[in-house]
Each structure stands twice: as C-alpha cells, then as structure tokens.
Amino acid sequence: MIQYKVLIPEISLLILAIISFFYGFISRNYRTTYILSFLSILTAIILSVFNFGQKEFTSELIKIDLYRQTLRILVLFIGVFIIGLSYSDLKLKSSKSVEYVFLLLLSLFGMNLMIVANDLLILYLALETFSLSLYILAGFYRKESLSIEAGMKYFILGTLSSIILLGSIVFFYAQTGSTSYETFKLLKTENLNILLGVVFLISAFAFKLSLAPFHAWAPDVYQGAPTAVTAFLSTAPKVAVFGALINIFLSINLKLNIQDLIVIISALSMLVGNVLALRQNNLKRMLAYSSIAHAGYMFMAFLLPEKELLISLIPYLIVYVFMNLSAFAFIMNIKNGESIQNYLGVGRKNPLLSFCIIVIMFSLTGVPPTAGFIVKFNLFKNLLSYGYGSLVFFALLMSIFSAFYYLRPVFYLYKDSLVIDIYNHPLNNSMALSGALLLIFLGLFPNLLLIF
C-alpha cells in the first residue's frame, strides 16, 4: 500500500499545475502564468527538501531513498531553470504560454514519479506522462517547419520505444508473475525471459537517453524544438531515465551477462557523438551529439557494483545538468545564437558572457579545475579499479578528441569584431554565470559532489 505522504511533492506539483492551468486559462496573463508555475515547482522543492534524508520507504509500487530524493530534487531544479529560460523567450510569451507551462509541470510530475517507481507499470505510466508532454513541447512552434518536424519525429520514434518497453514488461511478468521490482530480488537463476526483458528495457531507455544506435532523433529534435525545450530535453529526461535504470539494476540481484552490451553501447555512443559533433556549425545540434557522447560516458557506470555505480553516476548527472543548462542560457543571449559563426567578437563585446561559455566548454571537455573533470576522473578511476582499462582508454581518447569541437565556439569569441547583437536578458545572464561559477566551485571542492 502507498503511504501518500511520501509522494506529497509530486501530488502538490500536480494539483498546483492544474490550478495554475485553469487560472491562466481564465486570466490569459502570461506573467502570472509563469509566476504560478515557478511557485508550484518551488513548493514541490521545499516539500522534497523537508523529506530529504528521512527513513527509507519501500512498498510494492513506490520506493524512496537518498539517491532517489536527490534525483527528484534535481529534476525540480531543472524545471525552475527552464521556467526562467522560457520567460525570456518572446515566442513563449503568448496566449499559448498557459498550455506550455502546464505541459512542462506535467512532465516534471511524470519524471519524478518515474524516479520513485518500484513497479514496471507505474514506471510505464510515468514515462508516458512526461513523454506525451515532451512530444507536444518539441513541436510547440507550430508556425515553424523545423519545430513541427521535431515534434513528429520525436513522437513517432518515441512510440516505438514505448512498444519495446511494453515488450520488456511482458518478459518480466512472464517470469515472475508480477511487475514489482521487489519480486526481481527473489530471482535465483538467469534465464531467457529475464535476459530478454533487460535487453528490451535497455533498448527502450536507450532511446530516451539518446544512446547510439538509438540516437538518430536527437539532432533534429534538439535543433527544431524551442531552445528552452531543448535545454529541458537534454537534461531532465536523462535524470529520470537513468534514475529508473539504476532502480531496476539494483533490484535484480542476478549477475546478468550483459557487460558486453553495455560496453558496446557506451563505446558506440562516445564514438558517434564525438565524431559527428565535429561537423556541426549549429550549436544546438552540436550539443545534441555532445549529449549522446556524455550519455555513453554515464552508461559505462552500469558496469560497476551498486556503491561505485551511485558514486560515479549521480555526481556526473548533477554536473551534466548544470553544464547543459548553462550552455543553453548562453545560446539564448545571442541573436541567432544557434550558429557558431555568430559568436565572432562576442569576447570583446561582453567578457563576462564569454567567460561563462569558456568555463562551460572546458567543463564539457573535462578540463581541470572544472567539475566536468572531477566527475569524469571519478568515473574513469572506478572503472579502472574493476578492470575496464581498455574502455577507459577509449573514453579518454574520445574526451581529448571532443576538445576540437568544444573549443570552436571559444575560438570564435575572439576571432573578429562583433557582427551580431547580444540580448540583454538579466535572468539568462545570471543563470549562465551562476552555472559557470558553480562548475568552477564544484571543481575546486569535489567532496561536495562525491557524497554518495
């Protein structure tokens, strides 16, 4: 039986989302809509913080512990950041802002429910809740062909991944007679149903994580979606899906023979993401391929035992979120900021904004003393201690290779005189600067990250 008090943050978020939707629908005041949505997420964060560190709760449907609490708070912080980015986008300050904000809040509810799910059916319902919202958000600019294409492509391929996930649930149910993760702990021997269930599950989740070879949707969707939505797509679903994948992997006590599959998907994602990013002149497409590569790095953590998995993956997820959100805040400060060529001379015009993108790109590459270096070093060290030297060497080569495309925007900052306008969005400026400073701070004080 569920004790609903452990789900108060999610329940409050859903109720407040509905209230803000009807209020916004009546008033049609975009400013009020964004304020109400911000307060809704803030309320959920406060309630989650009050529950943080409390006794672990487990039922057949829901499980709450320290790392799940951390991830649900992280998702909510992403929501706050996205509300700020969306508020500065003139195209989202319209009569449709009510629907936009409601879909955003609904997707946050689904993601947090997915993180705490302890049952495959709850997981599936949660995934569909946030996926359906994201399909609409990706195509929210209905007058722009790229946005419509992004929404349709994401919807069609996302539906396929949902079908694969249902297949995974069937295999697990056929073996255990239940969809609860708790029954997975009772399994004594590995068999074909369990192995196929895990493989189908990884395949379905690999789509949401944009892992190769399930990555084809990412560049077009990232480019066509509104920039604030792209920032959301590149971060929040990864936190939710990686959280769910951790939950399932830790629930299955069997030693599954899928290490080779994890190695292949990780290596292929790093290779595809880094090599194809080198050809991109559109920064949103470049960050799409970057997210494929980083998903590959993070997926390697599933080769590790429980403790090392958590202390490797959770800090990486936190840093990855701040790197990406800060990068998109920077993009939204430059007129036509998707094109790298438009950064010519920005370094001379706005040194503070240039400092932000330099720190962000260094952190994405993994250059010390940024937090990006700390989490990569921590992951590689743990993998080395368990005998994955060849994979770590390949990942290190890919990290070095990534410098060639991450540093291209930095090169353009000081190449010529300014040829494009810089928007003066105080909110975006402060978010980009806060993210950059946080990446340096966590790089200098890594113990704050490695608390798991």
Curated annotation (Swiss-Prot):
Transmembrane segments annotated in the record for this chain: 6-26, 33-53, 70-90, 97-117, 120-140, 154-174, 194-214, 232-252, 258-278, 286-306, 311-331, 355-375, 387-407, 432-452
Subcellular location: Cell inner membrane
A single BP term in Gene Ontology: ATP synthesis coupled electron transport
Molecular function (Gene Ontology), one example: NADH:ubiquinone reductase (non-electrogenic) activity
Biological role stated in the UniProt entry: NDH-1 shuttles electrons from NADH, via FMN and iron-sulfur (Fe-S) centers, to quinones in the respiratory chain. The immediate electron acceptor for the enzyme in this species is believed to be ubiquinone. Couples the redox reaction to proton translocation (for every two electrons transferred, four hydrogen ions are translocated across the cytoplasmic membrane), and thus conserves the redox energy in a proton gradient.
Quaternary state and interactors: NDH-1 is composed of 14 different subunits. Subunits NuoA, H, J, K, L, M, N constitute the membrane sector of the complex.
Similarity-based family: Belongs to the complex I subunit 2 family.
Official protein name in the record: NADH-quinone oxidoreductase subunit N 2
Organism: Thermodesulfovibrio yellowstonii (strain ATCC 51303 / DSM 11347 / YP87)
